[in-house]
């Protein structure tokens, strides 16, 4: 746990956009729970476990990138990143109709529908090329690599938020990594020095 409250950290990070991220959290607490996208037990730890966890990836994403959030669900990590980083061209990819409808409505309410796009479908079927793919609680690393390899440009990367299983998943993805000539590294990152550590796996072309 942090010594500074997690919403206070978010306030400091988001600055002028704090009102928007606060509105998004309110949407998660209300409609996100009602629609079954967020568990009721998560309400008390939304800032720590979901918002700050998501935006820990921000430091790994270069300015002005095209980013795809694969299996976006309730919009994590894509929406918190898009609010924090208006320079990003964000696409939320979600195969389930109910979830994609939630995303569309949320983006409209947040005023983000002009720069964040929702694509309903599977990542492997998307007609899209991006610099960075992000994902959170979607699938094992080997599966993610298989789903997203054709989405990412040659110089791009996959950033997958993972928990304690990160190192084990990298080992188990060895065959997929080798076949596609990719390298993977586990990174310990924070949204802020006062925030908790987040584990992410970064996958790139070998030698990049």
From Swiss-Prot:
Principal localisation: cytoplasm
Molecular functions per Gene Ontology: rRNA (guanine-N7-)-methyltransferase activity
Protein family (similarity comment): Belongs to the methyltransferase superfamily. RNA methyltransferase RsmG family.
Gene3D superfamilies linked to this entry: Vaccinia Virus protein VP39 (3.40.50.150)
Function: Specifically methylates the N7 position of guanine in position 518 of 16S rRNA.
Gene: rsmG
EC code(s) of this entry: 2.1.1.-
GO CC terms, sorted: cytosol
PANTHER family: S-ADENOSYL-L-METHIONINE-DEPENDENT METHYLTRANSFERASES SUPERFAMILY PROTEIN
Signal sequence coordinates: none
Entry's localization field: Cytoplasm
A family per Pfam: GidB
Keyword set, alphabetical order: Cytoplasm, Methyltransferase, rRNA processing, S-adenosyl-L-methionine, Transferase
Organism of provenance: Cutibacterium acnes (strain DSM 16379 / KPA171202)
Protein name: Ribosomal RNA small subunit methyltransferase G
Binding site for S-adenosyl-L-methionine: 71, 76, 123-124, 136
